[in-house]
C-alpha cells in the first residue's frame, strides 16, 4: 500500500517555481526542489518523471493560476481596467537579478517547443483579456492588446536598467504613457 503524501503535488510545483526563478535554468536541480519542499529527490522522480517533467508541470500549474487571476480581474472596459489587470500580473520584484533570472527562462521558452507552447498559451490568455477590457482605440483591439503587451514587457527591461522606483510603479507609469499616446 502506498504511503500517503505529506506534501501535495500543488505545493511541490509551487516550490519548484520558486526554485526556478531563484536559480535559473542552469542551476535548477531536483535536489534544490527537494530541499525547498522537504521531500527526497527520488520522490520527485517518482511523482513527476524527470527535471523537464517537473518544469512543465510547474509551468502548467502556473498557467492555471494565471488564468484564474485574469478571470477574477474586473472586466470593465477602459484604461483603469487594463492597467489594473497588468498591475495584478506584475510581480513586485526588488532585485534586478531576479528579473535577469526570469529572462534566462524566457530564453528556454524560445528554444523548447513544449515550454514555447505554454508561454504562447499564457500570452494568448493575456491578449484576449486585454482586448476585452480596452477602451475604443483607433486600431483593432487585438493589435492594441499586442502593442500594450509589448509595452508592459518592455517596461520590465527598462526598469532592470534604470531602476526608477518600484517595478510595479514603473510599469504602471509606462502603461499610462502608452494610453496617453494611444488616445491622443
Q: Where would I find each of the regions flagged by the language model?
A:
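Amphipathic alpha-helical packing segments from all-alpha helical-bundle domains
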Residues: 95-103, 111-138, 143-146, 169, ...
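Short, basic, alpha-helical segments at the C-terminal edge of helix-turn-helix-like DNA-binding modules
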Residues: 60-66
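N-terminal intrinsically disordered/low-complexity leader segments
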Residues: 1-7, 184
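Cytochrome P450 catalytic-core helices
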Residues: 152
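Helix-turn-helix
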Residues: 11, 15-53, 57
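C-terminal peripheral helix-coil segments that are non-catalytic and often amphipathic
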Residues: 128, 132, 147, 158-184
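Hydrophobic alpha-helical connector segments
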Residues: 57, 68-99, 144-148
Amino acid at each position: 500500500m502506498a504511503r500517503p503524501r505529506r506534501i501535495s503535488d500543488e505545493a511541490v510545483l509551487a516550490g519548484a517555481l520558486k526554485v526556478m526563478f531563484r536559480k535559473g535554468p542552469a542551476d535548477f536541480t531536483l535536489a534544490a526542489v527537494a530541499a525547498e519542499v522537504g521531500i527526497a529527490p527520488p520522490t520527485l522522480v517518482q511523482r513527476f518523471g524527470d527535471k523537464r517533467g517537473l518544469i512543465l508541470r510547474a509551468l502548467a500549474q502556473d498557467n492555471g493560476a494565471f488564468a484564474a487571476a485574469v478571470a477574477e480581474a474586473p472586466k470593465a472596459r477602459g484604461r483603469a481596467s487594463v492597467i489594473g489587470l497588468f498591475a495584478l500580473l506584475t510581480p513586485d520584484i526588488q532585485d534586478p537579478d531576479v528579473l535577469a533570472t526570469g529572462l534566462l527562462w524566457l530564453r528556454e521558452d524560445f528554444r523548447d517547443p513544449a515550454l514555447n507552447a505554454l508561454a504562447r498559451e499564457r500570452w494568448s490568455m493575456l491578449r484576449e483579456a486585454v482586448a476585452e477590457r480596452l477602451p475604443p482605440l483607433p486600431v483593432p483591439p487585438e493589435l492594441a492588446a499586442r502593442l500594450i503587451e509589448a509595452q508592459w514587457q518592455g517596461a520590465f527591461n527598462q526598469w532592470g536598467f534604470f531602476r526608477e522606483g518600484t517595478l510595479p510603479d514603473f510599469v504602471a507609469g509606462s502603461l499610462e504613457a502608452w494610453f496617453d499616446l494611444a488616445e491622443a
